[in-house]
From Swiss-Prot:
Record GO cellular component, one term: extracellular region
Keywords: Repeat, Secreted, Signal
UniProt protein name: Putative cysteine-rich repeat secretory protein 40
Signal peptide span: 1-32
Subcellular location: Secreted
One Pfam family cited in the UniProt record for this chain: Stress-antifung
Main location group: secreted
Family label: Belongs to the cysteine-rich repeat secretory protein family.
Protein origin, superkingdom: Eukaryota
PANTHER family: CYSTEINE-RICH REPEAT SECRETORY PROTEIN 29-RELATED, CYSTEINE-RICH REPEAT SECRETORY PROTEIN 38-RELATED
Record bears the keyword Secreted: yes
Lineage: Eukaryota, Viridiplantae, Streptophyta, Embryophyta, Tracheophyta
Length: 273
């Protein structure tokens, strides 16, 4: 007696479905922890012009790239600037608060490679990934103003899906969480590697949902007293960028925030607010 055709089909489909379920679970876990380093956005600073192959600018640029690549990436943030126009070069990077050492190094390398490919021979450009941003500019050491917040390069991203239930309450509670994290990021007791962290993460129960969030400022350039001002400014843009969205962020070069309905950071130090 032979098994029926339908039975054979079920026997064939069962291991296949089990494999698919396993893969989906794996993908979900990777996504929730954000283990990938997804490209987000870039901006070529075309007003700064282009450099010629073999020029002094290219020599200085490559020297800076190699110097920063040889660092330990322990602080997650660094900048290097030297020279005067037309050969002034500044490179800076900022890694996400949970992406230090090797993770930060690999993101920096991806940023440099991405700028070379997307903004070929541009003297200036910025690229954002999930775990860092990298900027190259021809601004001279004299003109490089570390006491000014840069809002020009801010841009929003959001999840297209909307939350269910009381959207107004969700918006208010999520903004309240971001504001609390902004205060925490600027707390003088919030230190990392001998410097103010200018970074904070946390989570909060909002109705039946749990919101996970983080805020961060560019440690190597933004003065601590400016971080709060920068974060307050972009959090005010929440209604325009993220109204009722299941996740959203505003990215820039001075500060940024992000929130999701799932955990997206590697660190386990998030505290329920």
């Amino acid at each position: 007696m032979y098994p029926s055709c339908s039975l054979l089909q079920r026997l064939v489909w069962f291991p296949f479905l089990a494999l698919v379920a396993t893969q989906l679970l794996f993908i979900r876990n990777v996504s929730s922890l954000n283990l990938t380093n997804e490209y987000l956005h870039h901006k070529c600073l075309v007003s700064e012009g282009k450099y010629k192959p073999g020029s002094k600018y290219e020599y200085i640029l490559n020297d800076h790239i190699r110097f920063l690549a040889a660092g330990n990436f322990r602080s997650g943030s660094m900048h290097m600037t030297s020279g005067l126009k037309p050969n002034a070069v500044t490179i800076l990077y900022q890694c996400r608060g949970d992406s230090y050492n090797s993770k930060c190094r690999s993101c920096y390398a991806a940023g440099i490679s991405g700028l070379r490919r997307r903004c070929p021979r541009n003297k200036g450009g910025i690229i954002w990934f999930d775990q860092c941003f990298v900027e190259i500019t021809s601004i001279s050491v004299i003109d490089f103003n570390i006491s000014k917040i840069n809002y020009e390069n801010n841009f929003p991203l959001h999840n297209p899906n909307r939350v269910s239930g009381d959207i107004k309450s969700f918006n208010n509670e999520t903004m309240a969480l971001l504001k609390e994290l902004a205060l925490k990021a600027n707390n003088k007791d919030n230190m990392d590697n001998g410097k103010m962290a200018l970074y904070a993460s946390g989570e909060k129960r909002v109705g039946t949902k749990k919101v996970y969030a983080m805020v961060q400022c560019m440690r190597d350039l933004v003065k601590p007293k400016m971080c709060k001002e920068c974060l307050e400014s972009i959090i005010k843009e929440f209604p325009e960028c993220c109204d009722g969205k299941q996740g959203g962020r505003i990215l820039g070069t001075s500060c940024d925030f992000r929130y999701e309905l799932y955990p997206f950071l590697r660190t386990s130090d998030s505290k329920t607010v």
